[in-house]
Amino acid sequence: MIAKCGEVRDWHWAHRGTRTCDRWWEPETEWHRAWKNHFPKDWQERIHWSESGEKHIAGVKTERGIVLEFQHSNLRRDERESREMFYQKMVWVVDGLRLKRDRSRFFASLTRASIVKAKPLTYSLPSNEGALLRDWINSHNPVFFDFGEKSEPGDPLLFHTPVLWRLEPRSPKGEAHLSPILKTSFLNKYVRGLALKGIGYSAELRAVCAALLQQAPRPRPLIGFEPYMAMKRRRRRRF
């Protein structure tokens, strides 16, 4: 027995050999369902047919005709390109927590990045920094990395509300341009049709930097002979 999909949106079962499901389909997780539930039911699991008669099911298709694909599993480049060519107007939301080290590597790379724009805040780093960027840098459509609902203490930036990281599809060659986007702004754009708002350096980031300074470890007080030795080092003649 294998999973089968039909015109209805509930998964059911069929004997092998009669499978008519989308070949791009991946097993749905709680992460998929949580994302889809942000959108009206009649936007979810929208069925499309290719000219060759293949059936494809878009995760979400908005009333403005934009397809949102929520990608958890690894995706081959040829399959990604096929989907982008088929749907044209689409964006990707990628689960940044699929592999244990993806998140930590991504945020570690941000500590080596340079800021190329203040409003919206945009970072630039080499496009080969970590598997996530290598896998998605060649996408012709916007990619949003989802690293969960909360910041973690080791993150270079701490936000108090869920944030997605947008990979700019027109990044210069060899570079990846990334911008933090509030999840509420993302949903306002694709549910309500409002403009996507990035995070400006002057307002939100200033508060973030203040929070980072408060959490920075303070120097340990000198004990024992350490004050004496420190004074001697300061007085040591230099040639």
Predicted segments — roles?
Residues 70-72, 94-96, 147:
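Short, structured patches in soluble enzyme cores that scaffold and shape functional sites
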Residues 97-239:
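Non-catalytic C-terminal interaction segments of nucleic acid-processing enzymes
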Residues 7-21:
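Cysteine-rich micro-motifs
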Residues 19-22, 26, 30-32:
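DNA- and nucleic-acid-binding/regulatory domain cores of transcription factors and nucleic-acid enzymes
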Residues 5-6, 25:
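Short, glycine/acidic-enriched capping/hinge loops at junctions between secondary-structure elements
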Residues 1-4, 31-82, 105-109, 131-136, ...:
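Active-site metal-binding core of divalent-cation-utilizing nuclease and nuclease-like domains
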Residues 65-66, 88-92, 142:
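Hydrophobic beta-strand segments of well-ordered beta-sheets in folded domains
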Residues 75-97:
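Basic, amphipathic alpha-helical patches used to engage nucleic acids or provide basic targeting signals
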